[in-house]
UniProtKB/Swiss-Prot annotation:
One of its GO terms (cellular component) is nucleus. A zinc finger (NR C4-type) spans 53-73, 91-115. Composed of three domains: a modulating N-terminal domain, a DNA-binding domain and a C-terminal ligand-binding domain. This is Thyroid hormone receptor alpha. It comes from Rattus norvegicus. Nuclear hormone receptor that can act as a repressor or activator of transcription. High affinity receptor for thyroid hormones, including triiodothyronine and thyroxine. Residues 1-33, 457-492 are annotated as: Disordered. Zn(2+) 1 binds at residues 53, 56, 70, 73. Zn(2+) 2 binds at residues 91, 97, 107, 110. Binds DNA as a dimer; homodimer and heterodimer with RXRB. Interacts with NCOA3 and NCOA6 coactivators, leading to a strong increase of transcription of target genes. Probably interacts with SFPQ. Interacts with C1D. Interacts with AKAP13. Interacts with TP53INP2. Interacts with PER2. Isoform alpha-2 and isoform alpha-1 interact with TACC1, but the interaction with alpha-1 is weaker. The interaction with isoform alpha-1, but not alpha-2, is decreased in the presence of thyroid hormone T3. Residues 163-407 form the NR LBD domain. The keyword Zinc-finger applies. 3,3',5-triiodo-L-thyronine binds at residues 228, 277.
Amino acid sequence: MEQKPSKVECGSDPEENSARSPDGKRKRKNGQCPLKSSMSGYIPSYLDKDEQCVVCGDKATGYHYRCITCEGCKGFFRRTIQKNLHPTYSCKYDSCCVIDKITRNQCQLCRFKKCIAVGMAMDLVLDDSKRVAKRKLIEQNRERRRKEEMIRSLQQRPEPTPEEWDLIHVATEAHRSTNAQGSHWKQRRKFLPDDIGQSPIVSMPDGDKVDLEAFSEFTKIITPAITRVVDFAKKLPMFSELPCEDQIILLKGCCMEIMSLRAAVRYDPESDTLTLSGEMAVKREQLKNGGLGVVSDAIFELGKSLSAFNLDDTEVALLQAVLLMSTDRSGLLCVDKIEKSQEAYLLAFEHYVNHRKHNIPHFWPKLLMKEREVQSSILYKGAAAEGRPGGSLGVHPEGQQLLGMHVVQGPQVRQLEQQFGEAGSLRGPVLQHQSPKSPQQRLLELLHRSGILHSRAVCGEDDSSEASSLSSSSSDEDTEVFEDLAGKAASP
């Protein structure tokens, strides 16, 4: 029988034969099939460049339903099975049509029979439910492979060397021996009564306002808290090897940061409190009204964010060591040595984090960001409250970080005692800012004063030598305090 496939009009595929010329041929834009144009240039690696569709001879795009076919035959076969169309197909030429890329759209029955003849599998065509299940399985497999890859990458990350383990153990022991109440702080803490920090705010002569009772409670724990920070630093060999001048500068720069960090890691989300010095649990408003102002917000925010990291004692200890060995302190002598020490702690810190295998994605860079947050948020919050641009805290004339304050004595001490009552009962020098003091600055003054008193611990001086070195009321002599301390430490 003579075949005239180009004139066959029965059984056309409506989805592939939407536009035809008068002679029955399908119109093609720019002489190309739209599907072929969309797949132009794509050849799977397992196909030869000129591989042909086994059904129609057009350019193949891959394995589809167990055969190498083009996109057109793949779609035709899938639609036929999914919609169960093959029983409706018919052919006017006794199913003897020749199927090629020109005639494939003119006889659906012959095209479908050829699909079956070349081996296309009907059972591989999925219905909607099976297709959804397959996609879900694919996503599950991708997620499983992603987790396996993450585990492999964690296993391949370097862990601490024996030398780094020694550094880690020393820092951890230094932290534990100077951390008040240790891991039992929740059981031993005492909540500051609700009425403290909520009483009427007292206006100071310079216009600032503070709750004197809360302020008094906080000043009681500052000196022992600073003592523990100094003791922590002295237990680190790299710190003890530095000149006395650099030790003092580093302690002045990091003391508030380390104290804030120690308070932040003891944030309790259930009671929304911070435990100061391991013993006093305070609420945000109590800390704010007690003298720290907006700085209290920074510490509470830090505590909330750190609670998700679940840091252990070693990580807190190493974070403190990194804060201590910071080269951005003004006036340092051995900058290179301090920088190398910080790098050693950073490497040990990173390798210890790898050893713990945290489940938080990108744990290490996130933790480094928190380290910078500890340094910046406390100072910038305080500076913002005082109206200083850029968060730039004042610098002592000697280049030490004295928060823009000078040591004073005499009548000014008695004036502060009259203002603060018990909180103003200050033995030794106190601090006076060159400009009107904010409440949080007053607390920082006490912090700094205690730091001067404990600088003797760094250089091994006794109380009498410290008292004599700070006895002058002249501002010119005040600037020589740290030189005097350093000179005594160097003398036999």
